[in-house]
Amino acid sequence: MRGKSINLFLMDGEAGGRIKCTLANWTGIAYKIPRTELDRCKEREDLKQSGVYFLFGTSDTTGKGVVYIGQAGARKNGEGILNRLQEHKRNPEKDYWTEAIVFTTSNNSFGPTEISYLENRFCNLALKANRYEVKNGNDPTPGNITEEKECELEEFIDYAKVIMGTLGHKLFEPITKPVEVKTEVEEKQADDIGKLYLKRTIKTIGTVEAVGMQTAEGFVVLAGSHISPSDDDTISEDI
């Protein structure tokens, strides 16, 4: 993948405030807006347009990251994305979110068809990555688009993926990525690289087996592993 030039504008002069994000040779615009700073965005004309948005927070029960993905169309009264975010802020059923990420365009080119398609694709990509709990109750409809428009929107999605990660949310990236291989021998060799295996027999429990690997985000225990349900006093306190 070629390098990309991303411009991050700290609208409040600090990393924890509002951020406007643009990319060279791209008509899209992204905003990262803390929930507490929504009222300071009332004068931004591009937030009165159509677009898609993501509400990020943390589950009180599981501690896992949660996200709600939605769309907002521009209205005749001049209200669009920001008005929809304000509605969510007032909704007690959506009090879990702490910040929003918004995607729109510099030329106000999104219509109902475009935002419906983007909402559907973003939702399915997030579900596939399984990194966040997706709070959408229903699967958004993709709408009917031409193949030319689909190609155009898929390019927009590719840029949006890069920006989403840059703004701190790897929503579309699975924790462990599949390894591309060509033969069965290469597949086994590639599959074993970097993995650590544990197999141990505990008298009161039986055999426990686990497989893990080091990733760029830390050590990950892979699916299918088994662990002891209770602490083992033979393990050093340092561990």
What does each of the following model-derived ranges do?
Residues 73-125, 228, 235:
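Conserved short loop/helix modules at catalytic or binding sites
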Residues 104-110, 135-142:
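Low-complexity, flexible helical/coil segments
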